Amino acid sequence: YLSINSSHVSELLKILLSIFAILALIIAGYVGYVYLSYHREADNQALTIQSSSSSKDLQTAQDYQIMTYNIGYAAYPPDYSFFMDGGTESRAFSKQNVKHNLQEIQGVIQEHQPDFAFFQEVDKKATRSYNIDEVAALSQNFSDYSSVYGQNYNSAYLFYPITQPIGKSQSGLVTFS
């Protein structure tokens, strides 16, 4: 037979309410952090062109090869399944994996030798790609091209999915010509 007196119940309720209040404060603090750090990228921004010394004028009577490539922040080997597409992954498998994928991406570009190349989901600094500056990596490899980077995504640290948060992301589009 278990005897519970009202002072024990009162003490237990205080502990449970304290735990609930602490959790509520943590959640409210995080929501406030995400909300206060949010800012929409401005429309019609003036972007800086990084000019190459080998720039040349376009000719109207010449064919040009154009390439577009969503590099998926260099995290997508064939067995990768992104969580927002119904998969399980939110980050690259490893920093080494991002570096390897960047080399593979650069190999594809060099194989095709486009006159113009447009890339999406290129991380400048992001948890999901282990803070590798992919814009700098691509720019160094294609130094004979002029380039323009336009940031279109800059998020606070996102604790989603819970098991492996996507983290903080600064990402955009880069064009080489």
What would you call each of these model-derived segments?
Residues 4, 8-141, 149-170:
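N-terminal, active-site-proximal structural segment of metallo-dependent hydrolase catalytic domains
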Residues 170-172, 177:
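A substrate-binding/cap region within the structured catalytic cores of diverse enzymes
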